[in-house]
Amino acid sequence: MKNSTVSSLLCLLAAAIWGFAFTAQKAAIAVPPFMLTAVRGWIAGLFLIFVIMLFDKLRGGKRKLFSKKGLGVTRIEWIAGVLCGLVLTCATTFQQFGIVETDAGKTAFITALYVVIVPIYGIFLGKKSPLHVWISVGIAVVGFYFLCLTSEFTLAPSDLLVLICALIFALHITVIDRFADIV
């Protein structure tokens, strides 16, 4: 199979998993939001330890993950990891609080707005985006208006929580972008 086909199939798989996650989150509303975020974080952390050890093994075992000197992580890697983790925790917690009172589809749409919020953040960082990006931002704002705003031009509190989640997820992408070349 060609690399482009594999890449496309992997993107489709990731999108499907992401979409099903909202249904699972909605089903888990009986679990307190902070508890759910903590459990998700622990599961992800344990999985990442496994992935790190696997990649280390595939690369010849050059990186010492656990040694007497520490974890083999630089100061900047610690800062980047902690900052990304804190921002991600805030975003998922707001999302979980928001999904309690709104449906999964609406939560997914509002959360996905982070994609068009990132270029808006980019303006403040001196980054320019092409015209088609701004057209997409406009279309997304119109979609948000029709989906979430009432005739009195108000937003449900749960939708506001999910919108805050999208703003924080966009910040997460911005933080990752900041550290990607360094780490």
Question: Which sequence ranges carry the predicted segments?
Answer:
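Glycine-/small-residue-enriched transmembrane alpha-helix faces in small-molecule transporters
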Residues: 1-35, 39, 85-86, 90, ...
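Small-residue-rich packing faces within the transmembrane alpha-helices of Major Facilitator Superfamily
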Residues: 19, 42-46, 117, 141, ...
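Specific transmembrane alpha-helical segments of multi-pass solute transporters/efflux pumps
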Residues: 21-22, 53-111, 144-146
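Hydrophobic/aromatic residues within transmembrane alpha-helices
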Residues: 28, 36, 40, 98, ...
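C-terminal transmembrane-helix exit sites in multi-pass transporters
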Residues: 47-52, 114-135
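Hydrophobic transmembrane alpha-helices of multi-pass small-molecule transport proteins
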Residues: 48, 129-149, 161, 165-169
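Structural signal for membrane-spanning alpha-helices in multi-pass inner-membrane proteins
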Residues: 48-55, 95, 119-122, 144-148, ...
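Membrane-interface helix caps and helix-loop-helix hairpins in membrane proteins
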Residues: 96-102, 127, 148-157
